[in-house]
Amino acid sequence: MRLHLRACFLLLILSLASLPLEARVVRVEIASRTDVLNGKLFGNTGAYERITGRVYFSLPIANVHNQQIVDLDNAVNLKDGEVEFSSDFIAVRPKDAHKGNGSMLLEVPNRGRGRIIGLVDGGDWDLANDAGDAWLLRNGFTIVSLGWQWDAAGPGALRFFAPIAKENGKTITGLLRGDLMLSKEMLEIPLGHFILGDIGGSEYPVAAPDDPRNVLTVRDARDSARTLIARKEWQFAHTVDGKLTPGDRFIHLNGGFLPGMIYEYVYVVADPVVAGGGLAAIRDFASYAKHAADAITPAERVYAEGISQNGRFLRDFLYEGFNADEEGRMALDGVLAHVAGAGRGSFNFRFAQPSRDAQPTSSVFFPTDIFPFTDLPEKDPVSGQTAGLLDRATAEKVVPKIFFSNTSYEYWGRACALISISADGKQDASISDNVRIYHFTGLQHFSGPFPPAKGKADLEGQEPQSPLPIKYFWRAMIANMDAWVRSNTSPPPSAYPKIADATLVPLADYGFPAIPGVNKPHEASRGDRLDFGPNWQEGILSIEPPKVGEPFPVFVPQVDSDGNERDGVRSPEISVPLATYASWNLRDPSIGAPDQRVSFEVSYLPFAKTASDRQRSGDPRRSIAERYSRREDYFTRYTNAVDDLVKQRWILPEDRLAFLHRGEQEWEEATK
């Protein structure tokens, strides 16, 4: 974004002295402060406390490090050259800060929900009754979740509170677009972007319901032609107590919305929120924790963690130059951006839609998978532009240590290959010494249940989901990041598929075996060259839907004869397999569009138990009995695979037994 301003920004950075300002946290309001689990002691760290509240920031508009925030100078609460924002926060910290390890895990919450403690430690995300095995707490980390999304929806969501913008006191209007594919018939849909119920972003209400620029279209796939739905057939309305009532946050369609179709709406909105301040909030809280003598969460080192939407947020944070605080100091020492694929997002635009992602059948053609994709500079052969994610951080000498980690899903669902190849698709791209790229084979966007089961509702696929857990890889990544920043101990080298050894191939060369009854996708997600109007690279989108230019190359990981990926961090389930973990899952016919991929999921396709079973079904993959002479043979190989992961520091020694237990469970499930 804002590529043609990039050179000017870098010149400003290099020519201006740092302004004599502190990290701009101006006050902290505490809503609650309680001992975790009634003062339970966690290893040598001792007791922890959980603090909730709101933190307030003030951003000087003249500071060069704030000038990339869209509409900051138009904020209605601009006073004395500064704009105030605030964020909800949750902090879990050692009661005695001196007993902590000095490192903070700063969680960028996904749509307002902070869940990293539950994911890594296995207990309650809010530590209400159960801390799991308390790995983070036993190891002395401070964990903070900080609101950054202005429209985070649903109860308990951590919010970012930002002013609206006006130009010279006048209301700003514009066009906003949304889309979705339903899994069941509905008479009306909400405006906004919602995932799994009320999780998502509320976005903007319609400002002018009768404006002729408001349009509704339908099509059957991403690249299909749109069909305009006559204006008399729909209205901005909502059913209340059985009565259809005008409403500025719903669309009602006569005859109803059908499943398996992409409905896209464009409508007039007003009063944009200065959403880009959320990027500065993460920056300034990190610097506050490291430099303020009275910080409520003191830290020597800060590692930002983001999953999916918030992983994309961190990629955008780096690209837009937010890792230098207002004094030019490094804000984040480490970044762990997980399952972000090649994406960034709608985080710093006028009328920003931060919840929007880029799924197979929704949030299509949004400013998500947009150039540049690689950390080091790359050239777009079509536009001639040259840029990389780390250009600004490099110019300011604030490049953090970075893990870009992804699963099998992101190569098909998030255009992940673009982070490691040239924009023309001819070769692998070089990566920074401060970057590691990790591809966790066989895993999906979020871990599925065990025993394996199909997704439900909007996520019902044709096959069971991948049940492989990410938890233990997360623990090792956090430990490796801490060692890298703290003592310069190099983490495991990058592990991902490459063009050079044909483990990353064009979609047409993908060699998945012909498994009876298993349908394969005909396409994969891609990065597109989009044009939202003459000022969109300054954050103002005026053409909706955008003009779509030539797509970037589509590459996917190559597979072996079983259909499992050949390169990356290979789970024991991949190197000693009992099943195929296909990198995609198609929508179940019951929810419509069965030729399209379902969001987030990988397919679990078990092997036949015996050779005769395999031969009867026509399955080309060897059966379990043909691979392993008995249970002990399998478990010996599985144990060796686990030990290899421990040796390479992909998992921690203390998690070895948990992996071995899982291997036993998987054998029982596969052979029952």
Predicted features along the sequence, with ranges:
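Sec/Tat signal peptide C-region and signal peptidase I cleavage site
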Residues: 19-23
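Bacterial N-terminal signal peptides
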Residues: 7-18
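N-terminal secretory signal peptides that target proteins for export/translocation
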Residues: 1-5
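C-terminal His-loop and adjacent cap/lid subdomain of alpha/beta-hydrolase
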Residues: 24-672
